[in-house]
Regions:
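Acidic, glycine/GT-rich loop-and beta-edge segments that sit at the periphery of enzyme/chaperone cores
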Residues: 23, 174-232
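Phosphate/pyrophosphate-binding loops at sites that engage ATP/ADP/AMP, CoA/4′-phosphopantetheine
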Residues: 8, 113-126
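Glycine-rich phosphate-binding/hydrolytic loop that grips phosphoryl groups
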Residues: 2, 46-51, 158-186
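Active-site nucleophile and cofactor-binding loops and adjacent substrate-binding regions
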Residues: 1, 15-19, 36-44, 104-107, ...
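Glycine-rich phosphate-binding loops at beta-strand->alpha-helix junctions
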Residues: 108, 121-149, 160-161
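Adenine-nucleotide phosphate-binding core of ATP-dependent small-molecule kinases
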Residues: 86-115
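Glycine-rich phosphate-binding loop plus the immediately following alpha-helix
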Residues: 5-7, 29-72, 170, 174, ...
Length: 232
């Protein structure tokens, strides 16, 4: 939300389709008013497209480019990956081109988001200033399918797949202005001289006899892993 608002201050709806989930944010008066999420199934997300691209022998990028030249996108519905796989196989048997299958899958992602997550009565219900983000929207075929389905234009940032990280950075920057303090991150010189030693020990403080990995840093502070209790 912070990233989208920085790029489009009047944003009133955000759709984020990532690799495994769909997030929809309704904005009112500059604040998040409502949030919609997809169910446990990851169908209709980026991994869904990537899976079928691999099955058909294409990279995700090439599969997306091919879909832009579809003349008759296949109607594949918006079912889960298992059922969609059979639909794609049937489309291949019927002679559908890879371009039309790619476009059909992109449309199914959009329909899944619209009719199973957002469920608007009409396009105007979403808002007038819509930002779409998440790695899935780097696929121009998905972007175009969304715009055609709603018959409107939306804003897709060039860093669509990094909007979460960008928003976190903006938030950290703002917090630093309010509460100035030195960063806990190591500086470049500290990284160049960074060193630590590792040793393995067996703890004898209880009957678990945990095999521990002990990292000891230059300042003498240890970091212990491998324990099965809270003793270390």
């Amino acid at each position: 939300f912070i990233a989208a608002k920085s790029l489009l201050p009047e944003v009133d709806f955000i759709l984020d389709i990532g690799g495994q989930d769909i997030k929809c944010l309704k904005i009112h008066n500059g604040c998040i008013d409502n949030i919609f999420l997809n169910e446990a199934c990851s169908s209709g997300c980026g991994s869904f497209l990537q899976t079928f691209a691999g099955i058909l022998g294409y990279s995700a990028e090439d599969f997306a480019k091919i879909g832009l030249f579809a003349d008759k996108p296949v109607d594949l519905g918006s079912r889960c990956t298992v059922f969609m796989n059979s639909n794609v196989k049937q489309a291949q048997k019927d002679g559908a081109s890879v371009a039309n299958i790619s476009a059909g899958l992109s449309i199914s992602i959009v329909k899944n988001a619209l009719f199973k997550v957002m469920r608007p009565s009409r396009p105007d219900d979403l808002g007038k200033h819509i930002v779409v983000q998440g790695g899935s929207f780097l696929n121009n075929c998905v972007l175009r399918a969304f715009e055609q389905e709603l018959n409107l234009e939306v804003v897709r940032p060039d860093i669509a797949g990094l909007m979460g990280a960008y928003g976190a950075a903006l938030y950290a920057q703002e917090r630093r202005k309010l509460h100035p303090q030195d960063s806990a991150l190591l500086k470049a010189e500290q990284l160049r001289t960074f060193s630590h030693t590792v040793k393995s020990v067996t703890c004898g403080l209880c009957s678990n006899h945990c095999h521990l990995t002990v990292n000891i840093f230059a300042d003498g502070k240890p970091y212990i892993s491998g324990n099965r209790c809270e003793r270390p």
